[in-house]
C-alpha cells in the first residue's frame, strides 16, 4: 500500500473522502500526519469500507490524543473507550435532534471516530454548520430574523 493518501474534498467548506489507507493495520507516521492534517483542514473525513475492530478503532483514536470513556452509553466489549449506538424500530434514537456530544465535561472531546457496522437504507443524515444552526437559532430566538 502506498504511503500517499488520496484526499478528495467533498465540498468547498467541509468534508473529504480519503482512500489509500488500511485501518486494519497501523498507519505509518507519514500516513497519520496526512490524515491528521486532512481532519484539521476538512473537519469531517470519510474512510469508507474499513472493516475495523473496536480495538483497531481505539488504536487509531489514541494517536489523536487522550480518549474519553462515556459515562452513559454501553461500551464495546473489552473496549471502554468505544460506545455502541444500536438503534432500530424497538430501540429508536434518543438524540435525533440537534446536539453536541459530551459537552457537559470540563474538557470535551475534540472529535469522534465513527465506525458504522450497519446502516439504514435511508435517513441517518448528519448535518453540520448553517443547515443545523438556522433552525436552532429560530427555536431559541423566535422573534429574531435568523
PLM regions and their residue ranges:
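Non-heme Fe(II) oxygenase catalytic core, chiefly the N-lobe of the double-stranded beta-helix
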Residues: 2-146
Amino acid at each position: 500500500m502506498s504511503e500517499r493518501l488520496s484526499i478528495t474534498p467533498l465540498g468547498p467548506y467541509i468534508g473529504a473522502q480519503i482512500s489509500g489507507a488500511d485501518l486494519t493495520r497501523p498507519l505509518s507516521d507519514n500516513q497519520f500526519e496526512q490524515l491528521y492534517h486532512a481532519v484539521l483542514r476538512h473537519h469531517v473525513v470519510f474512510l469508507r469500507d474499513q472493516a475495523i475492530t473496536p480495538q483497531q478503532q481505539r488504536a487509531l483514536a489514541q494517536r489523536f490524543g487522550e480518549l474519553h470513556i462515556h459515562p452513559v452509553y454501553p461500551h464495546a466489549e473489552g473496549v471502554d473507550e468505544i460506545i455502541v449506538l444500536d438503534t432500530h424500530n424497538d430501540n429508536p434514537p434518543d438524540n435525533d435532534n440537534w446536539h453536541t456530544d459530551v459537552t457537559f465535561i470540563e474538557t470535551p472531546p475534540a472529535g469522534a471516530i465513527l465506525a458504522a457496522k450497519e446502516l439504514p437504507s435511508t435517513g441517518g443524515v448528519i448535518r453540520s454548520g448553517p443547515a443545523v444552526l438556522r433552525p436552532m437559532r429560530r427555536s431559541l430566538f423566535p422573534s429574531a430574523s435568523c
